[in-house]
Curated annotation (Swiss-Prot):
GO terms for biological process: arginine catabolic process; arginine catabolic process to glutamate; arginine catabolic process to succinate. This is Succinylglutamate desuccinylase. It comes from Pseudomonas aeruginosa (strain ATCC 15692 / DSM 22644 / CIP 104116 / JCM 14847 / LMG 12228 / 1C / PRS 101 / PAO1). The keyword Repressor does not apply. It catalyses: N-succinyl-L-glutamate + H2O = L-glutamate + succinate.
Length: 332
């Protein structure tokens, strides 16, 4: 197998490869662009016009998606997975991955869409670098641009595998992309309703890609992801990469749950209190009238939505950041 197929090993060791460009036996080109960044280009006769960006490790302790990308990279390098799509593999936060920590100084997935310009440190610099790499990768016109940013969550979930679909002015959510997610094992999709500051929000809103954040289970250390079943997603990504995927049928979205954002719970001060157990699962239902959170100045978040569920509850975020999202069932 080609040395560039060991991108994770290189990243964990903090090493640059001796050869930054290598070719497989059939002519597929592997190009190491930067730390944790590998571009795969198919031979011209096989290129099907798809540009697929796969990122993982924006949070360094979310290892199951990193291991998934590593398996795909090794298959490409060994010649057992023959790409028809251009693919950019990104391990987002190398230093946090090496430390096995969510982040070193700042939550990187709050630093996109220009937020990195307001910060400093390695994670702000890396967010800017990831934006640049994505911008260059998606600069070819008249091609299909698709981005999956793969994550696992801090806590368990009533719906284990779900996606967040960004929002941008004047764009409609794609039924065929939703069908593709369903076919890959994604059980639910949260349709967002305002611009975001995540990596997928950047590639969707600024670069025009179809882009999603995928939440794929609970975060665990390397080698301890046996309970995270990514077989359907891995197979779907292989079909996308080698060009043998059947066109998703977006006319029916049976089996896919859709949600929309009702409200975000923002932590304003150190007096913020979230009235949920630390181990409450994502997508836990909350009854109307439930006092969800309180903050300084008499600020109260009381559930008044029917069918409301909580996702990403985290009272430990910095002041001014989102400490949870209330979502409700939705339709297209």
């Amino acid at each position: 197998m080609l040395a560039l197929g060991k991108l994770l090993d290189l990243t964990l060791a903090g090493r640059e490869p001796t050869e930054k460009i290598q070719l497989t036996a059939d002519g597929t080109r592997l190009h190491w662009l930067a730390e944790g960044a590998l571009e795969v280009t198919p031979i011209g006769a096989r290129d099907n016009g798809v540009d697929l960006l796969l990122s993982a490790g924006i949070h360094g302790n979310e290892t199951a998606p990193i291991e998934l990308l590593e398996r795909l990279i090794r298959k490409v390098a060994a010649g057992t997975l023959k790409p028809a799509a251009r693919v950019l593999f990104l391990f987002g936060n190398p230093e946090a991955i090496r430390r096995g920590e969510r982040y070193v100084e700042q939550d990187m997935n709050r630093l996109f869409n220009g937020r990195h310009e307001e910060g400093s440190g390695n994670e702000a610099f890396r967010a800017a670098e990831l934006e640049r790499l994505a911008q260059v990768f998606f600069s070819k016109t008249e091609r299909v641009h698709l981005h999956y940013d793969l994550h696992t969550a801090i806590r368990g979930s009533k719906i284990e595998q779900f996606a967040l679909y960004p929002w941008a002015e004047g764009r409609q959510h794609s039924r065929s992309e939703l069908a593709r997610l369903r076919d890959a094992g994604i059980e639910a999709v949260l349709l967002q309703n305002k611009p975001g500051i995540t990596f997928s929000a950047y590639t969707y809103g600024q670069l025009g890609a179809e882009a999603f954040t995928l939440e794929l289970g609970k975060a665990r250390p390397f080698g301890e992801n046996q309970e995270v079943n990514l077989e359907r997603l891995e197979r779907s990504l292989e079909l996308l990469i080698d060009g043998s995927e059947e066109q998703p049928d977006g006319s029916r979205l049976d089996g896919l749950k859709l949600f929309s954002v009702s409200r975000e719970v923002i932590k304003h001060s150190d007096h913020f209190r979230l009235h949920l157990d630390d181990d409450v699962a994502n997508f836990t239902e909350l009854s109307p009238g439930y006092l969800l959170a309180e903050d300084i100045g008499g600020t109260r978040w009381v559930v008044d939505e029917v069918g409301a569920r909580i996702i990403f509850p985290n009272p430990r975020v910095k002041n001014g950041l989102r400490a949870g999202i209330l979502v409700v069932p939705a339709k297209l």
